[in-house]
Amino acid sequence: MDGARSVNKGTRGGEAGKGEKLADWADGRLGLYALAKANMRKVFPDHWSFMLGEICLYSFLILILTGVYLTLFFEPSGVEVVYHGSYEPLNGVVMTRAYESTLDISFDVRGGLLIRQIHHWAALVFVTGMLVHMMRVFFTGAFRKPRELNWVFGWTLLFLGIITGLTGYSLPDDLLSGTGIRFADGAILSIPIVGTYLSFFLFGGEFPGHDIIPRLFPIHVLVLPGIMLGLVVAHLILVFYHKHTQYPGPGRDNKSVVGMPFLPVYMAKAGGFFFLTFGVLALMGGLAQINPVWAFGPYSPQLVTTGAQPDWYLGFSEGLIRVMPGWEINFWGHTLEPGVFIPFSLFPLILLALGVYPFVEAWITGDKREHHILDRPRNVPVRTGLGVAWLSLYVVLLIGGGNDIVATHLHLSINAITWFVRVSVFVVPVLAFIVTKRICLGLQRRDRDKVLHGRETGTIRRLPHGEYVEVHEPLAQEQLHTLTQHEQEPPYEIGPLVDANGVRRPVKRSQWVRAGLARAMFGPDTRIEKPTAEEYREITSGDHH
C-alpha cells in the first residue's frame, strides 16, 4: 500500500510553483513570512528631504559595486617599474606599479576609466549626501530621543567616509595623491614626542617608503567599508525599529505615522530611485572628467602640483593648516610645530562638536520624552543659528584651503586672503548665528500674524468712511495646525534657593551652567509666543480689526 504524500498547495488551490516552494522552505528555517507580515505594511512618510538618506545609501552601494570591479585590476604595490603602455607621454618614465596599474585601468581595461570616474563621483556624492542628510536631521531635531544612537551611527559614517575618501584617492600614487599623503605625513610628524615614530611605523621607514600603498589598500577596501556596511545595516534597523520621523501636519503625532506602506509603494519608489541615482552617476562619470591621474604624472617627493587641492570634504582641514601662523618652538633640543599640530587637532574637534550636540541639548533641556514629530527650524532659532554658524565656519575654512586658487583666479593677494580667512574664522560664525536667529524670530512673528489675521489676498477694499484695508483670507485648518502644533516648554530652572524651612539648599555649579544655557537656548528671547485659542477666537469673531 502506498504511503500518503503531502502536496504543497499554492495560493490558488493548485500545486505550489517552484518559487513558492522555495519561499516555504526558507520560511520554515528563517521565519520570513512572519517578518514580512510585520513589516510589509509599515508606513513611511512621504517628503522629498527623506530622499537625502536614500541618496547616501544608493551611493554607498554603487561605491561597493564599482570598487569591487576596480580591485580586480589594481595592484597596490610600491615596486618601481618603467612604464610602457598606451599613454605615450609617460612611456619610459619610472613609476610605481600602483600608478602603472591605474593607468592600465584608465586606458586598457574595457570600461575602466568610466568605472573609475563613477567610483570617484559616487564618493563625492556619498559624503555630500551624508553631510546634507545630517544637517536635515540637525535642523529638524530628528536626533532627539530615541534616535541619539542613530545620530552617532550617522556621524561615525560621515567621519569614516571622509577617512575612506582620503585613503582611496591616495592609492593611485600620482603626483596629486602623493601630495596629499605628504600633507598627512607632515600632520603626523607635528605630534609631540611620538610623531616621528608614528610616521616611520606608517610608511615603513622615511617618507615616502614602499609600504604605505600596500597598507592603505586593505584599510580602504576591507576594514573601513566593512565597518561602514555594519553601521549602515544598524542604522536601517533602528529606522525600522523606531519608525520614521515626520513633519507636523493633521493626523500626525508621536503615536501615528501618515504615509505610504513599505510594500509595494515605498519599495517601488526606492527601486526606481536607486536606478535613477546610478544613472545620474554614470552620466557624471561618462561626461565629467575627474582626477585625470595621467596628467599629473608619478609622485616624486621633490615635486608638488601647483594648485593641488583635496576633495572638497577635506578642504577645511587644509584651510586650518594654511591660515595658522607658522609657529615653531625649540624646547630642550626638540622642535615643536604648533602651527601644524593645533589645526591638525582642531580637525576632529570641529566634527566632534557636531556629533555630541544632541547629548548636550538633551542635558540642557532635561527632556526624557520620545519625539517623532520634527521641528520647524524657525521654531528653534538658537539650534538653527548654531547649525548655520558651524556650516559658515566650514565654508570659511574651505576658502582658506583654496587661497592659492582664489588668488590666481580673482587676481588677489594671497596674504590678504589668508588674513581675511583668519579674521572670518572668528567673526563670520558669530554673524551667521545672529542673523539666522533674527530671521527665525521674524518668521515666527509672520506665522503668528498669519494665524491671527489670515493670509494676505492682495485685494484692497475701500470702507464706507474712506479707509483702505487689505482683505485677509483665513488659513485652512491644515495650515493652522502646522503653524501652531509646536510645543513651547519653559526652560530648565534651578528653582527656589531655600527650602520651606528657610534653609539654603546646595546648588551645583553644573546646575547654574545648565540653567544659563537653557535660558540662552530656550528662554523668552528665543521665541515668539504662539497665539492661544482665546486670542484666535477673539480676533476671528470680528470684535477687532
List each language-model region with its residue ranges.
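Membrane-interface amphipathic/re-entrant loop segments adjacent to transmembrane helices
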Residues: 323-339
